[in-house]
Amino acid sequence: MATIIYDNETTFDALKDKTIAIMGYGSQGHAHARNLHESGLNVVVGLRKGSSSWAKAESDGLKVMTVEEAAKAADVIMILLPDEKQASVYYSQIEPSLEAGNALVFAHGFNIHYNQIVPPKDVDVFMVAPKGPGHIVRRTYTEGIGVPGLIAVYQDATGKARDLALAYAKGIGATRAGVYETTFREETETDLFGEQVDLCGGLSALIKTAFEVLVEAGYQPEMAYFETCHEVKLIVDLIYEGGLERMWHSVSNTAEYGGMTVGPRIINEESREAMYEALARIQNGEFAKEFVLEGMVNHPVLKAMERQEKEHPLEVVGKEIRANIPWLNKKIDDD
């Protein structure tokens, strides 16, 4: 079982008198930077010249520099850029300024685990990965709570990498909910597996296929959308709040019996084998190689799939239905 560390077991001591550079000011970047700053730590934000986020970060009360300037100024450097951009930015704008005893921090282990970034041996390398989107990391921090997080140490040059990781996790509010110790390998491989097999890939494929079956069987697209896509959130919220047990307890007996008897026929041994195949491609680096090569030519396959997805009948009818839900439109505007 994983080791869990809570707020009362941690201090900011390891980060006192250190400058933390947050590279990037997107969903996670803005949350990390603002939370750390409001925790009393010394934070700078590293952005490219001309970035649309520059003025936003300054208006949030943060000191903003170019990535190169931030790397030179910092003792601890958190890289919160898209996976496919991290290596090029690291080698051209961060590594030249690294000094012995500095620390590199990641929120996902992809580039370290798959050797896209190979840090010098005299710097600490660790991970702090909150298990929630940036706006939730930020909101829960301001509410005095937090989201759970993961920490991992890849390289401990100073002997203080774990202390730094815990202090950083405390600074963003993660220790309030508990941080779980893991490894770069475990975090990377399980994260990719979850994204591909159920959270993003498996779930979206299941929704689309179920929608298509109902429409092909002659049912109205609107009815198919409500039953196969719209109501997913209702079920997921129940699982999120209390696990599968809470979900089964909350639905009707008809839904429970039908779900328990038919579900295993849909997600069956063939599905399990496909999951193992996906996991093997993650473990042996095949997926990483494919993704890196795709990024080197500006993601033509991904862009084509995005276009196809946008044109899918599920998306067309879903857009029309969501336009008629005022409270949902307000939430999207607020986000």
Curated annotation (Swiss-Prot):
Substrate binds at S252. Keywords: Amino-acid biosynthesis, Branched-chain amino acid biosynthesis, Magnesium, Metal-binding, NADP, Oxidoreductase. Residues 1-182 form the KARI N-terminal Rossmann domain. It catalyses: (2R)-2,3-dihydroxy-3-methylbutanoate + NADP(+) = (2S)-2-acetolactate + NADPH + H(+); (2R,3R)-2,3-dihydroxy-3-methylpentanoate + NADP(+) = (S)-2-ethyl-2-hydroxy-3-oxobutanoate + NADPH + H(+). Its cofactor is Mg(2+). Disulfide bonds: none annotated. Residues 183-328 form the KARI C-terminal knotted domain. Pfam families: KARI_C, KARI_N. Coiled coil: none annotated. NADP(+) binds at Y25, G26, S27, Q28, R48, S51, S53, D83, E84, K85, Q86, G134. Pathway: Amino-acid biosynthesis; L-isoleucine biosynthesis; L-isoleucine from 2-oxobutanoate: step 2/4; Amino-acid biosynthesis; L-valine biosynthesis; L-valine from pyruvate: step 2/4. PROSITE patterns: KARI_C, KARI_N. Binds 2 magnesium ions per subunit. Its EC number is 1.1.1.86. The active site is at H108. Mg(2+) 2 binds at D191, E227, E231. Mg(2+) 1 binds at D191, E195. NCBIfam families: ilvC (TIGR00465), PRK05479.1 (NF004017), PRK13403.1 (NF009940). Involved in the biosynthesis of branched-chain amino acids (BCAA). Catalyzes an alkyl-migration followed by a ketol-acid reduction of (S)-2-acetolactate (S2AL) to yield (R)-2,3-dihydroxy-isovalerate. In the isomerase reaction, S2AL is rearranged via a Mg-dependent methyl migration to produce 3-hydroxy-3-methyl-2-ketobutyrate (HMKB). In the reductase reaction, this 2-ketoacid undergoes a metal-dependent reduction by NADPH to yield (R)-2,3-dihydroxy-isovalerate. Belongs to the ketol-acid reductoisomerase family. This is Ketol-acid reductoisomerase (NADP(+)). It comes from Methanosarcina acetivorans (strain ATCC 35395 / DSM 2834 / JCM 12185 / C2A). The lineage of its organism: Archaea, Methanobacteriati, Methanobacteriota, Stenosarchaea group, Methanomicrobia. The gene is ilvC.
